[in-house]
């Protein structure tokens, strides 16, 4: 224990530090350091990760919390936290400095430094003549807590700098401490540090010149090297400073906001009061005894764990949403809580699922419960601003999300830093198949022409591998709020988000969980927006007011389930994906709980655990159902003896192996990370022995453990599925009974779901719904329903669909539109201020009432050409100098302007033009026999590569009659890589496979027909 490193920047000093906090703390422990201070620049974003690594690896090294600052280019220093007061002070200083600037910047003031009362200050002389001035100033205000930090990096001026620092220390009576200025945990990271510096400066490594580190001395160094560089007293001083720093992150305590409690109530009694009121609402005919017992058990544990404020906070937020007419739904493990149901946080009746409160709160786990609440995605901002207004920005902020380098950004940024041409990087990225899990991207790069033996090629691959996973910047969490009783900046630094009126803390959800700090998840869901808009449309056109509760009371509508069983579920929540639609005709959901199973079973967990086929066989009566005991039957009876849900695994561990609720939840957590650390295997002996002691066969015990491992990190909770099933049924019901309203609502709620507006419009047309084009005289901003002379409702497309049309342009167009409509294009031109707006309208053919075709409309848009000198010298021309666009050209223009076309489908159009060979259409596949050879052609509208599919990719092709499911095996994708990666219009020759009503085409040959489209097709949606 010879040394404490007091100045060390991790990769949370973005594009400066070249090692993760975890790597630094582990290496410091390996080298025998007494302490390590993670001191990122004006940031505490990396400290929790180092703290967690110490616990996980049981390290002896001590972590010191601190931060590095630049007051300006001439004054730099490190602040360290000796105690809790100093930590609060540091958080406040970082917050103030960050809040003064835009995201990613900070500005420290001299007053910030002068007002320090608790932090220890290590001044880092720059070697400039101004050092004496700064030493004078710092000594005047911080003499009692001030050290001079001496760094030695073996540069050409090292001896001069050493003498300079010693002179300053003697002159101002400053103790000297050794400092490393560490940027890397090992010297081998120097090339990566150079690369990060080049990225930061926007140049190549070769262009950095003197900005490059001259050596790897800014890594964690050995005792032998440090003793050569620093005097013993300077090393000893680092240990003395470390001895002053007793602050530990575990000492942080979260205090809940208290203003929600009315006079005369305690937090416990007020929660009980609200639950009592909720019981009357949720159970008007009386609370069943079993439910009442569960409520009392939950309330007792909530009180014991001191969580009433948490539940009251969530209740307050959802009540605000309810009062404002904002649809919401609690989900996740909260659906395991009857208290949450009574508080109207969740909508899943506990009598409909197997409630497992241990999944929600556990005494042994001793950490805050997790309640996710989804709000309409277009109105969630109202909820967020309510939280800010109620608690103030000093007490409420969003959690951070760490945006890290992923493959594409890593390749592009590293390549630029190494001087690789951007065209070559584009070529690499376009032609690397990341879905191919056997032929890694490294090997594919070599195939594409990268020279692996060249120095640049070796560096490129190594640097890309190293930088993937490195943090790039902090972004805002999708909705995780941290709300505190006192100023939040005394708990964690707060900074500005990129979005206006948003602030974020410097920790992400994993950091908060590690420190057992509470966050409230205020999430968004597009389907809730679509459902509300659908309800409003139904009320407008049918004078019927509906709610989600009204629809869920009709959960046994077999007409809806017949539609679901046919996989007619495009646009339906959670059961619209390719995999779900393939399963629906096999599982044939016929009730609400079937939907709960349907949503959960099409997940990697049940698939990897080999639970899907046994369940389907038992459901179809092809396999007997048996249980080794009554206790196991109680757990698995609803899923026919096959564990489908996480909760069932937990319950099995409890009833069959004697696990406590907390131990079983620890098993669940180990399941979630077993591939990373293998912790699940430490439960194997206890699980199997516990089952053997209770009379179960070894074969059964081992099979259960194998299924647990199969669940792995993909196990799906019944509570999640139950919440999702409510919206799945609701959206299916709306699609069945009010299809026009449903499709209009979906189109007006984009972006959301699996399908593009083009695909939704095609599906609406297949359901017999007329879709009308955008019209300057009849369209609104959003898509709307209009009644035809036949009495049927049709969808009129809205201006929001037009690319390049500004919001201001739409507003002016609608505000000034005469009652009788616009009579000529020049009238519109006088209203719209931006030329691009009127050009966009013409390109989208929105003037079809005022001009014969879009080409003529464009010409009229440019009718001021005669005023230009060049055109005044030309002879006059007719008013209609251009030929009409062909049908094919119109389709091209439609896609370019709006992303969809109401004209004939491109496949049908190309066939009529003789551009396609003979093929089978989507609606003809059901007439083909099993294992027959077929040829299909369609626009590539979707690709999915599930992590458990062993390299298989599922394509969705769309022709003029419907969608075609294509399975592409890995060998096929490798052999025909170009067509696989880039085709937008694809011909597939393959074998048709039929299983009941499920039809797939197993691809044999892929033929890229994209050139026939000439830019026609919409880009496919790809899901990994």
Swiss-Prot record:
Signal peptide: none
EC number: 2.7.7.7
Entry similarity comment: Belongs to the DNA polymerase type-C family. DnaE2 subfamily.
Protein species of origin: Vibrio vulnificus (strain CMCP6)
GO term, biological process aspect, one: DNA repair
Alphabetical UniProt keywords: Cytoplasm, DNA damage, DNA repair, DNA replication, DNA-directed DNA polymerase, Nucleotidyltransferase, Transferase
Keyword Cytoplasm: yes
GO cellular component: cytoplasm
Protein purpose: DNA polymerase involved in damage-induced mutagenesis and translesion synthesis (TLS). It is not the major replicative DNA polymerase.
Superkingdom of the source species: Bacteria
Protein name in the entry: Error-prone DNA polymerase
Annotated compartments: Cytoplasm
UniProt-recorded Gene Ontology molecular function terms: 3'-5' exonuclease activity; DNA-directed DNA polymerase activity; nucleic acid binding
Catalytic activity: DNA(n) + a 2'-deoxyribonucleoside 5'-triphosphate = DNA(n+1) + diphosphate
